[in-house]
């Protein structure tokens, strides 16, 4: 019905002004960039992905010995994202996965790349144990959570502002405690 096409430009052209070549002439502008690393071309080197929340645009850049080359062909491998997107390795397999906004919370996509960059939805809404109930971890669309191993136990925890924004909530990832592996999505609200 109203399908959208993804067009990839021929970026092999050199654009110059006064004899000076622009290094990323076709990448467009960035207004509210969120920067993450991922191995886009599976060569063992971390590349760069910029998510611009002002247009929900993903801009991939290949790391060529410290020179970042705009590579729009990788955009189609990413799921549709809006408001925010961060890349971090949730399951400790050495491949950065996608954390992104999802209806008052967040979704996680696993990096399933083998020969080509690919992702698979793990959960469309991450829950946390608030004592007696499992509720979604609220993450505002105007903010970005911190996703890091806060307690140094080997799995990624989440820091986010409370729903009213008055304080920071700590959601401890219980994967290592429950299974001994970090490939489980199991969070617990911790004060």
Residue ranges and their predicted role:
Residues 32-40, 81-90, 141-150:
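Beta-propeller blade termini
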Residues 42-52, 92-101, 152-162:
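Acidic/hydrophobic-patterned starts of short beta strands in beta-sheet-rich repeat architectures
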Residues 57-60, 105-107, 167-169:
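A short loop-to-beta-strand structural motif that recurs across blades of beta-propeller domains
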Residues 137-175:
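Repeat-solenoid scaffold signature
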């Amino acid at each position: 019905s109203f399908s959208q096409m993804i067009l990839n430009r021929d970026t092999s052209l050199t654009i110059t002004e006064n004899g000076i070549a622009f290094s990323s002439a076709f990448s467009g502008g960035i207004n509210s960039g969120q920067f993450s690393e991922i191995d886009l071309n599976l060569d063992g080197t971390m590349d760069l992905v910029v998510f611009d929340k002002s247009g929900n645009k993903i801009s991939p850049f290949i790391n060529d010995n410290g020179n970042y080359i705009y590579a729009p062909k990788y955009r189609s491998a990413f799921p549709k994202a809006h408001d925010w997107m961060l890349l971090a390795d949730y399951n400790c397999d050495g491949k950065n996965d996608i954390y992104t906004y999802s209806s008052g919370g967040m979704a996680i996509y696993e990096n399933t790349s083998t020969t080509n960059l690919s992702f698979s939805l793990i959960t469309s809404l991450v829950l946390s144990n608030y004592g007696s109930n499992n509720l979604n971890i609220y993450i505002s669309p105007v903010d970005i959570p911190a996703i890091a191993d806060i307690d140094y136990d080997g799995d990624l925890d989440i820091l986010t502002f409370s729903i009213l924004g008055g304080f920071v909530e700590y959601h401890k990832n219980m994967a290592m405690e429950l299974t001994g592996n970090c490939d489980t999505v199991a969070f617990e609200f911790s004060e």
